[in-house]
Amino acid sequence: MAPKAEKKPAAKKPAEEEPAAEKAEKAPAGKKPKAEKRLPAGKGEKGSGEGKKAGRKKAKKSVETYKIYIFKVLKQVHPDIGISSKAMSIMNSFINDIFEKLAGESAKLARYNKKPTITSREIQTAVRLVLPGELAKHAVSEGTKAVTKFTSS
């Protein structure tokens, strides 16, 4: 059975090459010039496109994560404890979810009040609505402190 398996890939490779050759032969009539324009541009972009791809990768990398900040807070609270990448991912998702809830709620509040701008007041009210009890109180006090520090500097 091993020789048959070896024969099949050998038979498939020429079969794969033949359609490519046939496509190249069929394409010259009208589509090959367009294909040539696209292929060299693609090849040219690979050389200079690595910068573009790197640019695209940079754009993908600009997706904000809170991993650095989660780690900093963890080290402030428990300096000798680490965190797994899966736990970090869960925490990052948690923060993104809370952020989306707060943003949505503050946008609703701005709409209800017929205001075009989300201010710290809408954010504070959204925090009180989204977060439960004591957690909301602490979040509001920390947020107020952060806004005061920001405006004073």
From Swiss-Prot:
Keywords from the named record: Acetylation, Chromosome, DNA-binding, Isopeptide bond, Nucleosome core, Nucleus, Ubl conjugation
Residues modified to N6-acetyllysine: K7, K37
UniProt biased composition (Basic and acidic residues): 1-28, 36-53
Any one GO MF annotation of this record: structural constituent of chromatin
Modification note: Can be acetylated to form H2BK6ac and H2BK33ac.
Gene Ontology terms: cellular component: nucleosome; nucleus
Family named by the database record: Belongs to the histone H2B family.
Annotated function: Core component of nucleosome. Nucleosomes wrap and compact DNA into chromatin, limiting DNA accessibility to the cellular machineries which require DNA as a template. Histones thereby play a central role in transcription regulation, DNA repair, DNA replication and chromosomal stability. DNA accessibility is regulated via a complex set of post-translational modifications of histones, also called histone code, and nucleosome remodeling.
Protein name (database record): Histone H2B.8
Organism per entry: Oryza sativa subsp. indica (Rice)
